[in-house]
């Protein structure tokens, strides 16, 4: 949020005459009381002749690809300057800001007289962005009539001695998205008296008489208050004054017409969003209801929006008038000929507004405030302030007719529930002995009503602070206003010698092993892309479809927590390939969330006491399983091309090798067995076992999944459940035999569907302890072997720890290995 220093200072000074601080001091104060200042932006700087001019004549130059205009500009004392300009949003008679030759604009841009498009240009007509008044590059800055006379100092008229604060307001402090809220915070920080700009002394109530506007509100829409007041007979040609336009501009809002400008101004001033409807375009009664299935609405930006049944609408008898809390509809838009305006101030459900604006991708200034909560007590005050401003600027008459729906039954007290707290709780939590009365004084400064009952305070939070729900929230207010810097910085003693846990050590070892093998680690998103399991073709009862849904997700189309790491990895792979990185090997180690049929939600448990054992057990039972997984994906070439050859494409064996890398890092033995498990290819998928426990799958992805997901041909993947793999104790260093090894090869013919791993296991079991290593180095199929059969050739390395082996010793062990393979998998020695 952007706010000018001058506006903040003006509102604070109402209750503290003569108060003044520098922008730098104000920045430090805001930071001290917990508000993040992203940037402090000085306006300008402008050096040299910058003046106000009136456009006296415009000549359209033809023959160019874009509009070019030669403008005669009066800069005072009937001095005319010819200036070439490409903007078209101004006309003869308009007041503009002119930078004359010799002026230097923000960014070090120096203006000089020059020849352009065959004419002499003696200066530049400036936009707001060129003067550092905002980011609007769309056209020239046109001042409203009467803002100044030609020849007036441009820097003075524009107020370029001001500073704009750019703040990041946290979600729990929606009241600070206004001058009212931030000025109150500054008054608290400096111990000043504060005059609320929404109080009756600043906004005297307007008279109320006559019939109310017909209104119906559907139950359960979450609307807490809905107020309406007409303003009749405004001048459609009226223009907002420069002081108002300037403040809107510095806050990042473009001025349009008085009816819209005053609603934006009051929103920035008091923090209450409002909307202006064309009263004459409303048909019949107004109503608030949920959208119907298949219903659409055209919003103010001219786009037809498809609505959801959870969206809340304002409707009349003929059409939708607004999407509640998000944006108005085109049907009741205030237009250039509008003379009668119906002002609306409502309180919408924050969660509903947040869901709607995210789903429709409509992040408006109003929605940003509504989703952080808005003060319901000032709806009518904001309405009256807006109506008075509009009548003052555009003429017309404020109608005494007021509609103020406050719920059913009507609500008269908007304050959150009272909170009881010991008066010394902030002192005990902070470890600071605050002066007597500090807690009550600070809580009263933020607007709370504080009563004493011995050593206990009863605190009723103000209507604009629904975030104050428990004693801890009140403690936070006292501590931040007193200054966090006074709290002693004491670190708790850390027990020495624990180091990393076995699980942490294993995770680090696996990550290093995969990285050394050419894989790149990513941090996967914890959310599932929409429809990913449909792309994979998973059955409806597949356990991976049983997900945990987040009620308020970061992205409306990704509300489900991931039950597998593969979707995030495959998305990253596609993104890399689309940017030209076609040879990709990625991995991730992260938790997944896997609820079961027994996973159940629980209600809120009080936080002002320790939970009972039963409550803790209930909380534990409600948590879904969150095992740690490791997953990897590969595509393109596994071995790069070069002078040595064309390279080797990724194949299923590379995924199997990734499993072995993980197994070696985990110090466990794994077994790979053929499996059919989507999204893997049924003939190139292996189920991974540690002992007899299944821990995951690896192999090449199914061709249909690859095609539907836009993946490179032959993409391979592996995913293992690390929590299902036991953490092994560190292995002792192996004893290296000083005796020479004996090398022999063996070729075995087996059925084509027998896994090579099963044959290797049989050979190892038969060869006994003398077999030091076995490696498959050739697979052969052909008519010589027979139909549906294959030949596997293994390199065997024999070695004894206590003697030199003879060829006869090695051959005997080899023969025993062949016999074992024959008995276990039906292998035949190839002649």
Curated annotation (Swiss-Prot):
Enzyme class (EC, first level): ligase
InterPro entries tied to this protein: aa-tRNA-synth_II/BPL/LPL, B3/B4_tRNA-bd, DNA-bd_dom_put_sf, Fdx_antiC-bd, Fdx_antiC-bd_sf, NA-bd_OB-fold, Phe-tRNA-ligase_IIc_bsu, Phe-tRNA-ligase_IIc_bsu_bact
CDD domains, A to Z: PheRS_beta_core, tRNA_bind_bactPheRS
B5 domain span: 414-489
Transferase among keywords: no
Gene3D superfamilies: 3.30.56.10, Bira Bifunctional Protein, Domain 2, Ferrodoxin-fold anticodon-binding domain, Nucleic acid-binding proteins, Phenylalanyl-trna Synthetase, Chain B, domain 3
Record GO terms (molecular function): ATP binding; magnesium ion binding; phenylalanine-tRNA ligase activity; tRNA binding
Positions annotated to bind Mg(2+): 467, 473, 476-477
Cofactor: Mg(2+)
Domain FDX-ACB: 737-830
Keywords: Aminoacyl-tRNA synthetase, ATP-binding, Cytoplasm, Ligase, Magnesium, Metal-binding, Nucleotide-binding, Protein biosynthesis, RNA-binding, tRNA-binding
Cofactor detail note: Binds 2 magnesium ions per tetramer.
EC number of this enzyme: 6.1.1.20
Pfam families: B3_4, B5, FDX-ACB, tRNA_bind, tRNA_synthFbeta
Organism superkingdom: Bacteria
Domain tRNA-binding: 44-155
Subunit annotation: Tetramer of two alpha and two beta subunits.
HAMAP family the record matches: Phe_tRNA_synth_beta1 (MF_00283)
Protein name per UniProt: Phenylalanine--tRNA ligase beta subunit
Organism: Mycobacterium bovis (strain ATCC BAA-935 / AF2122/97)
């Amino acid at each position: 949020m952007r706010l000018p220093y001058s506006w903040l200072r003006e509102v604070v000074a109402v209750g503290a005459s003569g108060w003044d601080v520098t922008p730098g001091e104000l920045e430090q104060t805001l930071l001290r009381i917990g508000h993040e200042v992203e940037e402090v932006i000085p306006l300008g700087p402008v050096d040299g002749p910058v003046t106000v001019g009136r456009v006296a004549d415009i000549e359209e130059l033809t023959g160019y690809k874009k509009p070019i205009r030669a403008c005669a500009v009066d800069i005072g004392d009937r001095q005319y300057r010819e200036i070439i300009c490409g903007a078209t949003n101004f006309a003869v008679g308009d007041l503009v800001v002119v930078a004359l030759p010799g002026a230097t604009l923000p960014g070090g841009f120096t203006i000089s007289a020059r020849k352009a498009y065959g004419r002499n240009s003696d200066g530049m007509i400036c936009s707001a962005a060129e003067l550092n008044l905002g980011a609007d590059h769309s056209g020239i800055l046109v001042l409203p009539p009467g803002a100044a006379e030609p020849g007036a100092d441009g820097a003075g008229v524009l107020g370029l001695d001001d500073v704009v604060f750019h703040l990041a307001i946290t979600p729990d402090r929606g009241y600070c998205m206004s001058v009212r809220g931030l000025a109150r915070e500054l008054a608290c920080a400096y111990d000043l008296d504060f005059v609320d700009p929404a109080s009756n002394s600043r906004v005297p109530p307007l008279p109320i008489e006559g019939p109310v506007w017909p209104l119906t509100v559907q139950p359960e829409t979450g609307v807490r208050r809905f107020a309406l007041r007409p303003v009749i007979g405004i001048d459609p040609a009226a223009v907002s004054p420069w002081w108002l336009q300037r403040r809107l501009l510095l806050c990042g809002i473009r001025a349009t017409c008085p009816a819209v400008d005053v609603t934006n101004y009051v929103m920035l001033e008091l923090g209450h969003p409002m909307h202006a409807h064309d009263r004459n375009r409303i048909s019949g009664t107004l109503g608030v209801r949920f959208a119907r299935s298949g219903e659409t609405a055209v919003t103010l930006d001219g786009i037809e929006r498809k609505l959801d049944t959870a969206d809340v609408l304002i409707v009349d008898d003929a059409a939708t008038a607004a999407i509640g809390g998000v944006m108005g509809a085109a049907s009741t838009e205030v237009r250039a000929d509008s003379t009668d305006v119906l002002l609306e101030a409502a309180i919408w459900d924050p969660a509903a507004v947040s869901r709607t604006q995210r789903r429709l991708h409509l992040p408006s200034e109003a929605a940003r405030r509504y989703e952080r909560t808005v003060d319901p007590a000032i709806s009518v005050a904001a309405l009256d302030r807006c109506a008075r401003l509009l009548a003052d600027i555009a003429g017309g008459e404020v109608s005494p007719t007021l509609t103020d729906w406050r719920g059913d039954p009507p609500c008269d007290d908007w304050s959150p529930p009272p909170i009881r707290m010991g008066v010394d709780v902030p002192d005990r939590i902070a470890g600071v002995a605050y002066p007597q009365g500090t807690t009550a004084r600070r809580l009263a400064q933020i607007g709370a009503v504080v009563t004493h009952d011995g050593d206990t305070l009863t605190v009723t939070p103000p209507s604009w602070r629904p975030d104050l729900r428990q004693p801890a929230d009140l403690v936070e207010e006292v501590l931040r206003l007193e200054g966090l810097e006074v709290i002693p910085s004491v670190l708790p003693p850390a027990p020495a010698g624990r180091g990393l846990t076995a699980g942490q050590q294993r995770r680090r070892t696996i990550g290093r092993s995969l990285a050394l093998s050419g894989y790149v680690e990513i941090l996967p998103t914890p959310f599932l892309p929409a429809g990913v399991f449909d792309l994979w073709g998973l059955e409806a009862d597949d356990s991976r479809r049983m997900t945990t849904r987040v009620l308020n997700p970061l992205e409306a189309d990704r509300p489900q927590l991931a039950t597998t790491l593969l979707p995030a990895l495959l998305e990253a792979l596609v993104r890399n390939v689309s940017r030209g990185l076609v040879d990709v090997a990625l991995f991730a180690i992260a938790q997944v969330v896997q609820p079961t049929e027994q996973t159940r939600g629980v209600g809120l448990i009080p936080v002002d006491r320790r939970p009972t054992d039963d409550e803790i057990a209930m909380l534990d039972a409600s948590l879904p399983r969150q095992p740690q997984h490791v997953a990897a994906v590969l595509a393109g070439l596994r071995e790069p091309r070069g002078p040595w050859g064309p390279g080797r494409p990724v194949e299923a064996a590379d995924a199997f090798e990734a499993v072995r890398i993980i197994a070696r890092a985990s110090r466990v033995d794994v077994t790979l067995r053929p499996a059919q498990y989507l999204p893997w290819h049924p003939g190139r998928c292996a189920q991974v076992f540690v002992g007899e426990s299944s821990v995951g799958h690896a192999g090449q992805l199914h061709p249909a999944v690859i095609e539907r997901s836009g993946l490179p041909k032959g993409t391979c993947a592996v995913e293992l459940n690390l929590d299902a793999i036991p953490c092994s104790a560190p292995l002792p260093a192996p004893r290296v035999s000083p005796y020479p090894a004996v090398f022999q090869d063996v070729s075995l013919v087996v059925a084509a569907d027998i896994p090579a791993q099963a044959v290797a296991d049989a050979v190892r079991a038969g060869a006994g302890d003398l077999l030091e290593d076995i490696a498959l180095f050739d697979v052969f199929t052909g008519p010589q072997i027979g139909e549906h059969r294959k030949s596997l050739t293994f390199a065997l390395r024999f070695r004894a720890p206590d003697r030199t082996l003879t060829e006869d010793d090695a051959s005997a062990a080899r023969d025993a290995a062949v016999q074992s393979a024959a008995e276990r998998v039906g292998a035949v020695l190839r002649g």
